[in-house]
């Protein structure tokens, strides 16, 4: 099976089944668009297991993704999609870049979830773009933009409730979507502490990659604790 693509966190391989791919999660962690990089044994296993559980949970709540099944500790079988070059970010609580861009205090709770689009382009450092930019760049049509926003908000609603049951708060997260050969839009990539900001409901302790970004704790211990909380709900 041929290696089709290798990114910061995953490798994508072909399979013997047409329209299906094998995803391997790597033991690498990056921050700052790759400026900070380390290898951590067990990280790929944790993110694969977390994403598999969350995608199955979302499927039970009517949200379709490319996920088919978990193959091994570090591998998934997924439906082949053409990735839409957007990071769709949903924010419930202000932190990170939006506090610098718009002056919100860290911890400010938005009245309604805020959806933002970032253009997936490493050379441009993944800039924030508007709906009009998305159409101008021919990334998605107006109706597809509305579909992306609706799906992102639906995912947020389900995940906020899930995190609440784990005594956690979903601060923000980013997701990616892809299109099948017949044009259907599916949730793709992953949902894990790599792609979310998650705070303890009572102490605001991080349960996400910010422990690595800010050198405030062990990423492996943090992700393991998160996975244990997730498995307790199964």
Curated annotation (Swiss-Prot):
Its EC number is 6.3.2.6. One of its GO terms (molecular function) is ATP binding. SUPFAM superfamilies: SAICAR synthase-like (SSF56104). Keywords: ATP-binding, Ligase, Nucleotide-binding, Purine biosynthesis. It comes from the Bacteria. It holds the Pfam family SAICAR_synt. One of its GO terms (biological process) is cobalamin biosynthetic process. Pathway: Purine metabolism; IMP biosynthesis via de novo pathway; 5-amino-1-(5-phospho-D-ribosyl)imidazole-4-carboxamide from 5-amino-1-(5-phospho-D-ribosyl)imidazole-4-carboxylate: step 1/2. It catalyses: 5-amino-1-(5-phospho-D-ribosyl)imidazole-4-carboxylate + L-aspartate + ATP = (2S)-2-[5-amino-1-(5-phospho-beta-D-ribosyl)imidazole-4-carboxamido]succinate + ADP + phosphate + 2 H(+). The keyword Zinc does not apply. It is an enzyme of class 6 (ligase). Coiled coil: none annotated. NCBIfam families: purC. Belongs to the SAICAR synthetase family. HAMAP family: SAICAR_synth. PANTHER family: MULTIFUNCTIONAL PROTEIN ADE2, SI:DKEY-6E2.2. This is Phosphoribosylaminoimidazole-succinocarboxamide synthase. It comes from Staphylococcus haemolyticus (strain JCSC1435).
